[in-house]
Protein backbone atom coordinates (compact mmCIF):
# COMPACT_ATOMS: atom_id res chain seq x y z
CA UNK A 1 0.00 0.00 0.00
CA UNK A 2 1.37 3.39 -0.98
CA UNK A 3 0.52 6.80 0.41
CA UNK A 4 -0.02 9.17 -2.48
CA UNK A 5 -1.01 12.37 -0.66
CA UNK A 6 0.88 14.53 1.78
CA UNK A 7 -1.92 16.93 2.68
CA UNK A 8 -0.64 17.66 6.17
CA UNK A 9 3.06 18.08 5.42
CA UNK A 10 2.89 21.71 6.56
CA UNK A 11 2.29 20.61 10.15
CA UNK A 12 5.34 18.32 10.18
CA UNK A 13 8.89 19.09 11.22
CA UNK A 14 11.58 20.26 8.83
CA UNK A 15 13.33 16.96 9.46
CA UNK A 16 10.31 14.95 8.34
CA UNK A 17 9.79 16.96 5.16
CA UNK A 18 13.42 17.43 4.11
CA UNK A 19 13.52 15.56 0.79
CA UNK A 20 17.13 16.55 0.18
CA UNK A 21 18.33 14.04 2.77
CA UNK A 22 15.84 11.25 2.18
CA UNK A 23 15.71 8.71 -0.62
CA UNK A 24 15.34 10.92 -3.69
CA UNK A 25 18.05 9.41 -5.83
CA UNK A 26 18.20 7.11 -8.87
CA UNK A 27 19.64 4.53 -6.47
CA UNK A 28 16.38 4.36 -4.54
CA UNK A 29 14.22 4.92 -7.63
CA UNK A 30 15.66 1.68 -9.01
CA UNK A 31 14.51 -0.09 -5.87
CA UNK A 32 11.01 1.26 -6.38
CA UNK A 33 10.99 0.09 -10.00
CA UNK A 34 11.83 -3.39 -8.75
CA UNK A 35 9.18 -3.19 -6.02
CA UNK A 36 6.55 -2.40 -8.66
CA UNK A 37 7.52 -5.27 -10.97
CA UNK A 38 9.68 -7.86 -9.18
CA UNK A 39 11.12 -10.73 -11.19
CA UNK A 40 9.97 -14.26 -10.38
CA UNK A 41 10.99 -17.23 -12.55
CA UNK A 42 7.42 -18.56 -12.69
CA UNK A 43 5.02 -15.82 -11.59
CA UNK A 44 6.72 -12.88 -13.33
CA UNK A 45 9.56 -14.02 -15.62
CA UNK A 46 9.66 -10.66 -17.42
CA UNK A 47 9.90 -8.61 -14.25
CA UNK A 48 12.78 -6.46 -13.02
CA UNK A 49 15.74 -8.44 -11.68
CA UNK A 50 17.11 -6.93 -8.48
CA UNK A 51 20.79 -6.18 -9.08
CA UNK A 52 20.84 -3.11 -6.87
CA UNK A 53 20.84 -5.08 -3.61
CA UNK A 54 24.25 -5.77 -2.04
CA UNK A 55 23.15 -8.87 -0.19
CA UNK A 56 25.09 -12.09 0.32
CA UNK A 57 22.75 -15.04 -0.18
CA UNK A 58 25.35 -17.58 -1.28
CA UNK A 59 25.83 -19.38 2.06
CA UNK A 60 22.37 -19.59 3.57
CA UNK A 61 22.56 -23.39 3.42
CA UNK A 62 25.54 -23.42 5.80
CA UNK A 63 23.68 -21.34 8.39
CA UNK A 64 20.53 -23.43 8.00
CA UNK A 65 22.51 -26.62 8.60
CA UNK A 66 24.11 -25.14 11.71
CA UNK A 67 20.70 -24.20 13.13
CA UNK A 68 19.45 -27.74 12.52
CA UNK A 69 22.43 -29.11 14.41
CA UNK A 70 22.04 -26.61 17.25
CA UNK A 71 18.32 -26.29 18.05
CA UNK A 72 19.05 -25.11 21.59
CA UNK A 73 20.39 -21.83 20.21
CA UNK A 74 16.90 -20.65 19.26
CA UNK A 75 13.87 -20.15 21.48
CA UNK A 76 11.75 -20.95 18.43
CA UNK A 77 12.45 -24.68 18.76
CA UNK A 78 11.22 -27.35 21.15
CA UNK A 79 14.74 -27.74 22.48
CA UNK A 80 15.29 -24.02 23.01
CA UNK A 81 11.93 -23.03 24.51
CA UNK A 82 13.27 -23.50 28.03
CA UNK A 83 15.29 -20.30 27.60
CA UNK A 84 12.29 -18.24 26.50
CA UNK A 85 11.44 -16.52 29.78
CA UNK A 86 14.98 -15.44 30.53
CA UNK A 87 15.48 -14.05 27.03
CA UNK A 88 12.10 -12.30 26.92
CA UNK A 89 12.96 -10.09 29.89
CA UNK A 90 15.00 -6.86 29.78
CA UNK A 91 18.72 -7.44 29.37
CA UNK A 92 21.77 -5.24 29.83
CA UNK A 93 21.61 -2.47 27.22
CA UNK A 94 25.32 -2.93 26.68
CA UNK A 95 24.59 -6.35 25.21
CA UNK A 96 24.97 -9.90 26.44
CA UNK A 97 28.61 -10.44 27.52
CA UNK A 98 28.79 -13.68 25.54
CA UNK A 99 27.50 -11.87 22.44
CA UNK A 100 30.06 -9.07 22.66
CA UNK A 101 32.83 -11.61 23.20
CA UNK A 102 31.69 -13.66 20.21
CA UNK A 103 31.53 -10.54 18.03
CA UNK A 104 35.03 -9.50 19.06
CA UNK A 105 36.38 -12.97 18.24
CA UNK A 106 34.57 -12.98 14.90
CA UNK A 107 36.04 -9.58 14.02
CA UNK A 108 39.47 -11.01 14.76
CA UNK A 109 38.77 -14.03 12.60
CA UNK A 110 37.61 -11.96 9.63
CA UNK A 111 40.86 -10.02 9.85
CA UNK A 112 42.99 -13.14 9.69
CA UNK A 113 43.74 -13.26 13.40
CA UNK A 114 46.29 -10.48 12.93
CA UNK A 115 44.63 -8.17 15.48
CA UNK A 116 42.65 -8.48 18.70
CA UNK A 117 39.48 -6.66 19.73
CA UNK A 118 38.31 -5.84 23.24
CA UNK A 119 34.70 -6.99 23.90
CA UNK A 120 34.30 -4.01 26.26
CA UNK A 121 34.62 -1.68 23.27
CA UNK A 122 31.92 -3.46 21.24
CA UNK A 123 28.80 -1.27 21.11
CA UNK A 124 25.60 -2.54 19.49
CA UNK A 125 23.47 -0.69 16.98
CA UNK A 126 20.58 -1.43 14.64
CA UNK A 127 22.67 -2.52 11.67
CA UNK A 128 25.54 -0.60 10.11
CA UNK A 129 23.06 2.17 9.28
CA UNK A 130 22.50 2.77 12.99
CA UNK A 131 26.17 2.29 13.79
CA UNK A 132 27.26 4.89 11.26
CA UNK A 133 24.72 7.42 12.47
CA UNK A 134 25.71 6.77 16.08
CA UNK A 135 29.38 7.45 15.43
CA UNK A 136 28.54 10.66 13.58
CA UNK A 137 26.38 11.85 16.48
CA UNK A 138 29.30 11.14 18.81
CA UNK A 139 31.89 13.02 16.77
CA UNK A 140 30.21 16.00 15.11
CA UNK A 141 27.72 18.81 15.48
CA UNK A 142 25.20 20.10 12.96
CA UNK A 143 27.03 21.90 10.16
CA UNK A 144 30.30 20.03 10.63
CA UNK A 145 31.63 17.97 7.74
CA UNK A 146 33.29 14.66 6.91
CA UNK A 147 35.45 13.95 3.91
CA UNK A 148 34.50 10.82 1.95
CA UNK A 149 36.16 9.40 -1.17
CA UNK A 150 33.81 9.24 -4.14
CA UNK A 151 32.25 7.18 -5.51
CA UNK A 152 30.63 6.26 -2.20
CA UNK A 153 27.56 4.41 -0.90
CA UNK A 154 24.49 6.50 -1.90
CA UNK A 155 22.59 6.04 1.36
CA UNK A 156 25.38 7.77 3.27
CA UNK A 157 23.55 10.95 2.27
CA UNK A 158 20.57 9.68 4.25
CA UNK A 159 22.21 7.64 7.00
CA UNK A 160 24.93 10.11 7.95
CA UNK A 161 23.29 13.45 7.19
CA UNK A 162 19.54 13.32 7.60
CA UNK A 163 19.18 13.48 11.38
CA UNK A 164 22.70 14.62 12.31
CA UNK A 165 22.80 17.69 10.07
CA UNK A 166 26.41 17.09 9.05
CA UNK A 167 27.83 17.63 5.58
CA UNK A 168 29.66 15.15 3.35
CA UNK A 169 32.47 16.52 1.21
CA UNK A 170 33.41 14.20 -1.68
CA UNK A 171 37.05 13.49 -2.41
CA UNK A 172 37.02 12.95 -6.19
CA UNK A 173 38.59 9.69 -7.39
CA UNK A 174 38.53 8.70 -11.05
CA UNK A 175 39.34 5.96 -13.53
CA UNK A 176 42.78 7.36 -14.41
CA UNK A 177 44.23 5.44 -11.45
CA UNK A 178 41.40 2.91 -10.98
CA UNK A 179 39.60 5.18 -8.50
CA UNK A 180 42.36 4.94 -5.90
CA UNK A 181 42.34 7.57 -3.19
CA UNK A 182 45.47 9.70 -2.88
CA UNK A 183 46.74 11.85 -0.05
CA UNK A 184 46.93 14.74 -2.50
CA UNK A 185 43.20 14.49 -3.25
CA UNK A 186 42.40 14.31 0.46
CA UNK A 187 44.54 17.34 1.18
CA UNK A 188 42.91 19.37 -1.60
CA UNK A 189 39.40 18.51 -0.37
CA UNK A 190 40.37 19.41 3.18
CA UNK A 191 41.97 22.72 2.19
CA UNK A 192 39.01 23.68 0.00
CA UNK A 193 36.68 23.05 2.94
CA UNK A 194 38.88 25.20 5.16
CA UNK A 195 38.74 28.04 2.63
CA UNK A 196 34.94 27.79 2.69
CA UNK A 197 34.96 27.99 6.51
CA UNK A 198 33.61 24.45 6.81
CA UNK A 199 34.71 22.62 9.93
CA UNK A 200 35.99 19.18 8.91
CA UNK A 201 35.65 16.66 11.74
CA UNK A 202 36.88 13.55 10.01
CA UNK A 203 37.50 11.25 7.08
CA UNK A 204 35.20 8.29 6.33
CA UNK A 205 36.65 5.27 4.55
CA UNK A 206 34.69 2.26 3.31
CA UNK A 207 37.18 -0.59 3.16
CA UNK A 208 36.54 -2.83 1.25
CA UNK A 209 34.92 -0.24 -0.98
CA UNK A 210 31.25 -0.01 -1.81
CA UNK A 211 30.76 0.36 -4.81
CA UNK A 212 34.23 -0.44 -6.18
CA UNK A 213 34.83 -3.84 -4.57
CA UNK A 214 38.48 -2.96 -3.92
CA UNK A 215 40.60 -2.88 -0.77
CA UNK A 216 42.98 -0.23 0.54
CA UNK A 217 46.60 -1.27 0.84
CA UNK A 218 48.68 -0.88 3.96
CA UNK A 219 50.65 2.14 2.74
CA UNK A 220 47.50 4.04 1.78
CA UNK A 221 45.95 3.39 5.17
CA UNK A 222 49.12 4.54 6.92
CA UNK A 223 49.20 7.74 4.88
CA UNK A 224 45.54 8.50 5.57
CA UNK A 225 45.99 7.78 9.27
CA UNK A 226 48.96 10.13 9.33
CA UNK A 227 46.97 12.84 7.55
CA UNK A 228 44.02 12.66 9.94
CA UNK A 229 46.31 12.68 12.95
CA UNK A 230 48.28 15.64 11.67
CA UNK A 231 45.08 17.64 11.26
CA UNK A 232 43.54 16.31 14.49
CA UNK A 233 40.44 14.95 12.75
CA UNK A 234 38.74 11.58 13.13
CA UNK A 235 39.20 8.53 10.93
CA UNK A 236 36.05 6.40 10.65
CA UNK A 237 36.57 3.08 8.89
CA UNK A 238 33.47 1.27 7.65
CA UNK A 239 34.68 -2.34 7.42
CA UNK A 240 31.39 -4.14 6.91
CA UNK A 241 32.70 -6.03 3.85
CA UNK A 242 35.83 -7.32 5.62
CA UNK A 243 35.11 -11.02 5.02
CA UNK A 244 33.88 -10.66 1.44
CA UNK A 245 37.44 -10.62 0.08
CA UNK A 246 37.73 -13.43 -2.46
CA UNK A 247 41.05 -12.67 -4.15
CA UNK A 248 44.38 -11.03 -3.47
CA UNK A 249 45.36 -8.67 -2.00
CA UNK A 250 44.09 -9.53 1.46
CA UNK A 251 42.05 -7.12 3.53
CA UNK A 252 43.98 -4.85 5.88
CA UNK A 253 42.03 -3.42 8.80
CA UNK A 254 42.82 -0.03 10.26
CA UNK A 255 43.28 -1.94 13.53
CA UNK A 256 46.38 -3.56 12.04
CA UNK A 257 47.81 -0.17 11.15
CA UNK A 258 47.22 1.04 14.69
CA UNK A 259 49.20 -1.92 16.02
CA UNK A 260 52.08 -0.92 13.74
CA UNK A 261 51.82 2.78 14.52
CA UNK A 262 51.10 2.80 18.25
CA UNK A 263 53.82 5.29 19.11
CA UNK A 264 53.09 7.61 16.22
CA UNK A 265 49.34 8.15 16.25
CA UNK A 266 46.46 9.15 18.48
CA UNK A 267 44.16 6.14 18.74
CA UNK A 268 41.41 8.30 20.21
CA UNK A 269 40.75 9.58 16.68
CA UNK A 270 40.12 6.14 15.14
CA UNK A 271 36.80 4.28 14.99
CA UNK A 272 35.49 1.18 13.20
CA UNK A 273 31.96 0.44 12.00
CA UNK A 274 31.08 -3.22 11.47
CA UNK A 275 28.05 -5.46 11.00
CA UNK A 276 27.04 -9.01 10.11
CA UNK A 277 24.90 -7.98 7.14
CA UNK A 278 27.50 -8.61 4.45
CA UNK A 279 30.05 -11.01 5.91
CA UNK A 280 27.41 -13.41 7.29
CA UNK A 281 24.58 -12.47 4.94
CA UNK A 282 22.29 -11.49 7.82
CA UNK A 283 20.97 -7.97 7.09
CA UNK A 284 17.58 -8.88 8.53
CA UNK A 285 19.15 -9.50 11.94
CA UNK A 286 20.11 -5.80 12.14
CA UNK A 287 23.43 -6.31 13.91
CA UNK A 288 25.62 -3.23 13.73
CA UNK A 289 28.74 -2.52 15.74
CA UNK A 290 30.57 0.63 16.76
CA UNK A 291 34.12 -0.15 17.84
CA UNK A 292 36.07 2.87 19.02
CA UNK A 293 39.54 3.21 20.50
CA UNK A 294 38.27 6.31 22.32
CA UNK A 295 36.83 5.69 25.81
CA UNK A 296 34.54 8.72 25.68
CA UNK A 297 33.11 7.64 22.33
CA UNK A 298 32.46 4.13 23.64
CA UNK A 299 30.61 5.52 26.66
CA UNK A 300 28.55 7.93 24.55
CA UNK A 301 27.72 5.30 21.94
CA UNK A 302 26.55 2.92 24.67
CA UNK A 303 24.11 5.52 25.96
CA UNK A 304 22.81 6.08 22.45
CA UNK A 305 22.51 2.36 21.72
CA UNK A 306 19.18 2.22 23.56
CA UNK A 307 17.65 3.76 20.41
CA UNK A 308 18.69 0.80 18.26
CA UNK A 309 19.29 -2.35 20.27
CA UNK A 310 19.83 -5.82 18.86
CA UNK A 311 17.14 -8.16 20.18
CA UNK A 312 18.21 -10.53 22.93
CA UNK A 313 17.08 -13.54 20.92
CA UNK A 314 19.33 -12.46 18.05
CA UNK A 315 22.25 -11.95 20.42
CA UNK A 316 21.65 -15.33 22.02
CA UNK A 317 21.54 -17.17 18.70
CA UNK A 318 24.57 -15.42 17.22
CA UNK A 319 26.64 -15.78 20.38
CA UNK A 320 26.24 -19.55 20.04
CA UNK A 321 26.88 -19.56 16.30
CA UNK A 322 29.92 -17.28 16.27
CA UNK A 323 31.45 -19.14 19.21
CA UNK A 324 31.52 -22.30 17.11
CA UNK A 325 35.06 -21.90 15.78
CA UNK A 326 34.84 -24.85 13.42
CA UNK A 327 31.66 -23.50 11.85
CA UNK A 328 33.04 -19.96 11.53
CA UNK A 329 36.26 -21.12 9.88
CA UNK A 330 34.40 -23.29 7.40
CA UNK A 331 31.82 -20.58 6.70
CA UNK A 332 34.38 -17.88 5.95
CA UNK A 333 36.41 -20.18 3.72
CA UNK A 334 33.38 -21.42 1.80
CA UNK A 335 31.88 -17.94 1.48
CA UNK A 336 35.09 -16.66 -0.08
CA UNK A 337 35.15 -19.56 -2.55
CA UNK A 338 31.53 -19.06 -3.57
CA UNK A 339 31.95 -15.31 -3.98
CA UNK A 340 35.02 -15.87 -6.15
CA UNK A 341 33.15 -18.38 -8.30
CA UNK A 342 30.10 -16.14 -8.73
CA UNK A 343 32.26 -13.08 -9.45
CA UNK A 344 34.23 -14.95 -12.11
CA UNK A 345 31.09 -16.34 -13.74
CA UNK A 346 29.41 -12.95 -13.86
CA UNK A 347 32.38 -10.91 -15.05
CA UNK A 348 33.24 -13.52 -17.66
CA UNK A 349 29.68 -13.24 -18.94
CA UNK A 350 30.05 -9.48 -19.21
CA UNK A 351 33.41 -9.76 -20.94
CA UNK A 352 31.89 -12.00 -23.60
CA UNK A 353 29.85 -9.04 -24.80
CA UNK A 354 32.64 -6.52 -24.41
CA UNK A 355 31.68 -5.05 -21.04
CA UNK A 356 34.55 -4.40 -18.67
CA UNK A 357 34.51 -4.00 -14.92
CA UNK A 358 36.98 -2.43 -12.54
CA UNK A 359 39.28 -5.16 -11.28
CA UNK A 360 38.03 -6.05 -7.82
CA UNK A 361 38.85 -8.51 -5.08
CA UNK A 362 36.02 -8.02 -2.57
CA UNK A 363 32.40 -7.09 -2.10
CA UNK A 364 29.13 -8.34 -3.52
CA UNK A 365 29.13 -6.25 -6.70
CA UNK A 366 31.07 -5.07 -9.74
CA UNK A 367 31.81 -1.54 -10.93
CA UNK A 368 30.61 -1.93 -14.51
CA UNK A 369 31.96 0.33 -17.25
CA UNK A 370 29.24 1.19 -19.77
CA UNK A 371 30.90 4.32 -21.15
CA UNK A 372 30.92 2.89 -24.71
CA UNK A 373 27.11 2.81 -24.58
CA UNK A 374 26.69 6.48 -23.72
CA UNK A 375 25.33 8.82 -26.38
CA UNK A 376 27.60 11.49 -24.96
CA UNK A 377 30.01 11.57 -22.06
CA UNK A 378 27.51 13.31 -19.79
CA UNK A 379 25.47 12.42 -16.76
CA UNK A 380 22.30 13.11 -18.75
CA UNK A 381 23.33 10.31 -21.10
CA UNK A 382 24.12 8.06 -18.16
CA UNK A 383 20.64 8.59 -16.79
CA UNK A 384 19.10 7.95 -20.19
CA UNK A 385 20.96 4.66 -20.42
CA UNK A 386 19.93 3.75 -16.88
CA UNK A 387 16.30 4.47 -17.74
CA UNK A 388 16.41 2.01 -20.64
CA UNK A 389 18.14 -0.65 -18.53
CA UNK A 390 15.43 -0.33 -15.89
CA UNK A 391 12.38 -0.10 -18.18
CA UNK A 392 13.41 -2.22 -21.18
CA UNK A 393 16.17 -4.59 -20.09
CA UNK A 394 14.43 -4.94 -16.73
CA UNK A 395 17.55 -4.91 -14.57
CA UNK A 396 17.90 -2.73 -11.49
CA UNK A 397 21.49 -1.59 -11.65
CA UNK A 398 22.66 1.58 -9.91
CA UNK A 399 24.09 4.51 -11.91
CA UNK A 400 27.43 5.95 -10.89
CA UNK A 401 25.99 9.42 -10.45
CA UNK A 402 24.01 8.18 -7.45
CA UNK A 403 27.37 7.20 -5.88
CA UNK A 404 28.68 10.71 -6.59
CA UNK A 405 31.03 9.30 -9.23
CA UNK A 406 32.80 12.10 -11.09
CA UNK A 407 32.73 10.29 -14.45
CA UNK A 408 29.56 9.29 -16.32
CA UNK A 409 29.05 5.75 -17.55
CA UNK A 410 29.82 3.57 -14.54
CA UNK A 411 27.20 1.38 -12.85
CA UNK A 412 27.22 -0.80 -9.75
CA UNK A 413 25.75 -4.24 -10.37
CA UNK A 414 25.26 -6.78 -7.55
CA UNK A 415 25.77 -10.48 -8.17
CA UNK A 416 25.46 -12.30 -4.81
CA UNK A 417 21.77 -11.76 -3.99
CA UNK A 418 20.32 -14.33 -6.40
CA UNK A 419 20.59 -17.95 -7.46
CA UNK A 420 22.61 -19.23 -10.42
CA UNK A 421 19.61 -19.40 -12.72
CA UNK A 422 18.68 -15.75 -12.13
CA UNK A 423 22.27 -14.67 -12.77
CA UNK A 424 22.19 -16.43 -16.13
CA UNK A 425 18.87 -14.79 -17.02
CA UNK A 426 20.36 -11.40 -16.16
CA UNK A 427 23.40 -12.11 -18.33
CA UNK A 428 21.14 -13.22 -21.17
CA UNK A 429 19.23 -9.94 -20.96
CA UNK A 430 22.48 -7.98 -21.02
CA UNK A 431 23.70 -10.03 -23.98
CA UNK A 432 20.49 -9.36 -25.85
CA UNK A 433 20.61 -5.66 -25.07
CA UNK A 434 24.22 -5.07 -26.01
CA UNK A 435 23.92 -7.19 -29.12
CA UNK A 436 26.29 -9.89 -30.26
CA UNK A 437 27.17 -10.99 -33.78
CA UNK A 438 28.25 -14.57 -33.95
CA UNK A 439 30.80 -15.79 -36.43
CA UNK A 440 31.31 -19.51 -36.11
CA UNK A 441 32.08 -20.27 -32.48
CA UNK A 442 33.29 -16.77 -31.70
CA UNK A 443 31.21 -13.90 -30.36
CA UNK A 444 32.00 -10.37 -31.48
CA UNK A 445 30.69 -7.55 -29.28
CA UNK A 446 29.11 -4.68 -31.16
CA UNK A 447 29.05 -2.01 -28.49
CA UNK A 448 29.92 0.64 -31.04
CA UNK A 449 26.91 -0.29 -33.17
CA UNK A 450 24.71 0.02 -30.10
CA UNK A 451 26.27 3.40 -29.40
CA UNK A 452 25.30 4.52 -32.90
CA UNK A 453 21.73 3.41 -32.21
CA UNK A 454 21.75 5.57 -29.10
CA UNK A 455 22.79 8.60 -31.12
CA UNK A 456 19.64 8.21 -33.20
CA UNK A 457 17.46 8.41 -30.10
CA UNK A 458 16.49 11.66 -28.47
CA UNK A 459 16.82 10.25 -24.95
CA UNK A 460 17.93 13.01 -22.67
CA UNK A 461 17.22 13.86 -19.07
CA UNK A 462 17.70 17.12 -17.25
CA UNK A 463 18.47 16.61 -13.58
CA UNK A 464 15.91 17.96 -11.21
CA UNK A 465 16.84 18.90 -7.67
CA UNK A 466 15.76 15.41 -6.69
CA UNK A 467 17.63 13.66 -9.54
CA UNK A 468 14.32 11.94 -10.16
CA UNK A 469 13.52 10.46 -13.57
CA UNK A 470 9.81 10.80 -14.24
CA UNK A 471 9.93 8.31 -17.11
CA UNK A 472 10.64 5.47 -14.71
CA UNK A 473 7.21 4.08 -14.04
CA UNK A 474 6.96 4.68 -10.31
CA UNK A 475 4.42 5.99 -7.91
CA UNK A 476 5.45 9.18 -6.06
CA UNK A 477 5.75 7.25 -2.85
CA UNK A 478 6.27 3.56 -2.29
CA UNK A 479 5.23 1.62 0.76
CA UNK A 480 8.01 0.16 2.89
CA UNK A 481 7.26 -3.38 1.73
CA UNK A 482 9.85 -6.11 2.41
CA UNK A 483 11.78 -5.42 -0.81
CA UNK A 484 12.04 -1.71 -0.10
CA UNK A 485 15.24 0.15 0.83
CA UNK A 486 13.19 1.61 3.66
CA UNK A 487 13.35 -1.87 5.15
CA UNK A 488 16.62 -3.18 3.71
CA UNK A 489 18.34 -0.03 4.88
CA UNK A 490 21.97 -1.05 4.48
CA UNK A 491 22.76 -2.04 0.90
UniProtKB/Swiss-Prot annotation:
Keywords: Ethylene biosynthesis, Fruit ripening, Lyase, Pyridoxal phosphate, S-adenosyl-L-methionine. It catalyses: S-adenosyl-L-methionine = 1-aminocyclopropane-1-carboxylate + S-methyl-5'-thioadenosine + H(+). Pathway: Alkene biosynthesis; ethylene biosynthesis via S-adenosyl-L-methionine; ethylene from S-adenosyl-L-methionine: step 1/2. One of its GO terms (biological process) is ethylene biosynthetic process. One of its GO terms (molecular function) is 1-aminocyclopropane-1-carboxylate synthase activity. The modification N6-(pyridoxal phosphate)lysine is found at residue 278. Homodimer. This is 1-aminocyclopropane-1-carboxylate synthase. The gene is ACS1.
Amino acid sequence: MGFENEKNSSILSKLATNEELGENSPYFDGWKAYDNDPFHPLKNPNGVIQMGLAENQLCFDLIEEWIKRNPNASICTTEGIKSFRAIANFQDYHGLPEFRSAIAKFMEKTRGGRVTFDPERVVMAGGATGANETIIFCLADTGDAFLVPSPYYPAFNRDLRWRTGVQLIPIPCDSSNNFQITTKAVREAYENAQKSNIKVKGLILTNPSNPLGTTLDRDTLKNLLTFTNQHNIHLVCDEIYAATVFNTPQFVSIAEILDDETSHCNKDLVHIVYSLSKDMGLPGFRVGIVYSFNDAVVNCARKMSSFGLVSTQTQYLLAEMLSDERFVSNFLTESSKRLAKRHKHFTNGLEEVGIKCLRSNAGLFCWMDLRPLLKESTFDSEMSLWRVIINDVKLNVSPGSSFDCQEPGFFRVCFANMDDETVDIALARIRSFVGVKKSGDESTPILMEKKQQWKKNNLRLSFSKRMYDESVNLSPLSSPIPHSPLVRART
